[in-house]
């Protein structure tokens, strides 16, 4: 299984962190490949060039998220990876630089997207159970959405549908954009991936001041 690991070549911390992600991926039978994302200023250029709008169905949360440079940069990074998945026509694992692979439960059948961590910053309540795939039921603002986009499997047809949705409906925070309207989301248990810290890829984009936002 191949994995794309999203990082920022302009932010040294994400490079070191992505190297650790690679190490953990190899340990569990995955072939990792670093994938350079875009800092907010370049993401804004990409959005303008591709005539992308913003998904703002009404709730204030979407407007707040869309106003953040880190949110825009993160989403464009994932969008570019989805395009790469379609180009290669291969089921692929998507990881962010602060993801850590901890098991082989990623290696299970799924339909469109397989979320690799049901518990985000919490302990894994499923750690001593048999590997399985379950329906993803997390809901936010009336939509079934991902909760964190730091680790998931995606099939080419699902990547294509997400790309279509981005151009038709507009973009927002990645984990709010990946939703039941476009794809079927399932979750692997016990977790295959965890996020190593609460400073996410999205936050790295927003907090770092070594590049022009």
Feature roles, as predicted:
Residues 1-95, 99-213:
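An acidic/histidine-cluster motif and surrounding catalytic segment
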